[in-house]
């Protein structure tokens, strides 16, 4: 009797998992907080790997900003490198709130990402932030092409978050 239902249970389980994963992707796309953060949005198209750079800087403050008119808010940090203070965009606040970023004024950090002009202002679009000595604080984009983590399917995101 048990073996008779085994194929049915396997198929039902696979269908349930597939439906759940598909639903989570639809929910992300329909999420009003996603406004301006979609994978193909004008904002995300500003990440240019040719502008990729590694920077060591000091945290000035963690804050919330609206990168472009009509977008939902972003978590950002102001950092100081030498005499220059500039803004670093991390991710949408619904993905990671400023209060969830374990950084404070005076922390020494390493940034990886790309420079971009956003709404008339030169900013750094981060892909990864590490705190000296090499403690990863947040990974938000693929370094190789700038794909935002918040646009990835759950299974791909899980793999990326496990990677060093």
Where are these regions (language model features)?
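OB-fold (S1/OB) nucleic-acid-binding surfaces
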Residues: 68-90
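Sec/Tat signal peptide C-region and signal peptidase I cleavage site
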Residues: 22-28
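Short boundary/loop segments of OB/S1/cold-shock single-stranded nucleic-acid-binding domains
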Residues: 32-54
């Amino acid at each position: 009797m048990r073996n008779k239902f085994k194929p049915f249970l396997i198929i039902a389980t696979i269908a349930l998992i597939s439906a759940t994963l598909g639903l989570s992707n639809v929910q992300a796309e329909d999420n009003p907080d996603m406004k301006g953060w979609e994978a193909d949005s004008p904002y995300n198209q500003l990440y240019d790997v040719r502008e990729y750079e590694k920077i060591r800087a000091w945290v000035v403050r963690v804050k919330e900003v609206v990168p472009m008119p009509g977008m939902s808010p972003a978590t950002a940090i102001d950092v100081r490198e030498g005499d220059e203070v500039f803004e670093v965009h991390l991710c949408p606040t619904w993905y990671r709130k400023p209060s969830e970023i374990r950084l404070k004024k005076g922390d020494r950090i390493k940034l990886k990402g790309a420079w971009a002009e956003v709404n008339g202002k030169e900013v750094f679009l981060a892909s990864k932030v590490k705190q000296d000595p090499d403690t990863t604080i947040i990974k938000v984009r693929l370094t190789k092409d700038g794909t935002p983590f918040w646009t990835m399917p759950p299974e791909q995101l899980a793999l990326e978050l496990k990677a060093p």
